[in-house]
A protein has these predicted regions:
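Extracellular/luminal regions of secreted and cell-surface proteins that mediate adhesion/ECM remodeling
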Residues: 244-343
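C-terminal PAP-associated
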Residues: 1-244
């Protein structure tokens, strides 16, 4: 088993921000023969994890409410392990101060470590710092990976001094990312599980939250967290990232053109994501400039389940009129697509 801890260079005796790992081999028959390896340090992108010198009173609540615990210097519940066919993955997070000044704003530093096989060294595959919309506090997080490699993350959110809306009380929220998204970023928009309706009455808050997967489909994320909602309660919410459909394609971005000097033969490139369970190939995609004739072409290669691919249309667009603002729309035209709302 692997034991991990985060260490901040603001702490005495710590020179650089890092994650420290120990391998523990327990001999259940002869406990005295158990072994703990020397520590392995993985240097991280610098972070600030100290709030108020390490005290338990950190994040002021709206309307002069008591400042509650940011749960600093702790890897939050829990580091999650998952085996895939060609690598192992571990996810974890802890709170950081993303403001960089005397004004505090809690954010979530999260990591995915990978090893190529059991017993091989762990390496940082991706690390990101999540900040909530409107510069709200985000902390007390828990994250896990579903059967498709998508990440779901639940967390606590509340107004900070940097927020335009100062009245958001402690609530429970979620975000996430698809497995094929650009690394280091939680790409999904924030979702609301429950908004708080009152301040937490003391400094102690949460201790930890907990996310887990529904064993029924290995896709639904269940997240439980502490909020004030008609009293102090632990409330569970459920959300899902992976599709339940066999056939489901989506155009997730129009990559070019974007802006600048455009030409009479402008290339149009889009990114397609296969959200379904089945691999797909030989489907049509289209683009349209304003109300002009729709361009339809065939994507002949295969996009495996959960993967993304770029396609550049062979038919170019005339976008050369100076001062003109062009509107470009694009769609996937898969026969039998079971969710046409995201095409």
């Amino acid at each position: 088993a692997t034991v991990m801890y985060m260490q901040d260079d603001a702490w005495s005796g710590v020179d650089t921000d890092h994650v420290k790992l120990w391998n523990v081999a327990i001999d259940w028959d002869t406990p005295n023969d158990s072994e703990v390896s020397a520590a392995v340090e993985l240097t991280t992108t610098p972070f600030v994890s100290v709030f108020d010198g390490g005290s338990f009173s950190n994040l002021p609540q709206p309307d002069g409410g008591i400042a509650i615990d940011a749960l600093q210097a702790t890897i939050m519940n829990q580091a999650q392990f998952r085996k895939f066919s060609n690598y192992n993955s571990a996810l974890f997070n802890f709170v950081v101060d993303v403001d960089g000044s005397s004004t505090k704003q809690a954010g979530i530093r999260w990591y995915e470590l990978r090893q190529t096989a059991d017993g091989e060294p762990w390496e940082i595959f991706q690390e990101g710092t999540y900040t909530a919309p409107d510069n709200r506090h985000a902390w007390n997080a828990s994250l896990i990976m579903d059967v498709r490699g998508n990440i779901g993350m639940g967390y606590s959110g509340m107004s900070s001094d940097n927020s335009s809306d100062s009245q958001v009380r402690v609530g429970s929220y979620y975000t996430g990312r698809f497995a094929q998204d650009p690394i280091n970023v939680m790409t999904l928009e924030e979702g609301i599980i429950v908004e708080g309706d009152a301040n937490i009455p003391g400094t102690r808050y949460g201790d930890y939250s907990k996310i887990d997967l529904d064993p029924d489909n290995d896709k639904k994320f269940w997240f439980i967290n502490e909020v004030m909602s008609g009293g102090r309660k632990n409330i569970a919410g459920v959300f899902q990232i992976a599709s339940n459909f066999n056939n489901d394609l989506a155009i997730i971005s129009i990559d070019t053109p974007f802006s600048g000097v455009l030409s009479t033969n402008q290339s149009v490139t889009v990114t397609i994501q296969n959200l379904g369970e089945a691999d797909v190939s030989g489907f049509d995609v289209s683009y349209q400039i304003g109300n002009n004739v729709e361009v339809i072409e065939t994507y002949s290669e295969t996009i495996t389940s959960g993967s993304i691919a770029q396609y550049t249309f062979t038919t170019t667009a005339d976008l050369s009129t100076e001062g003109e603002t062009y509107t470009i729309t694009s769609s996937s035209l898969l026969n039998g697509d079971e969710d046409p709302t995201n095409d």
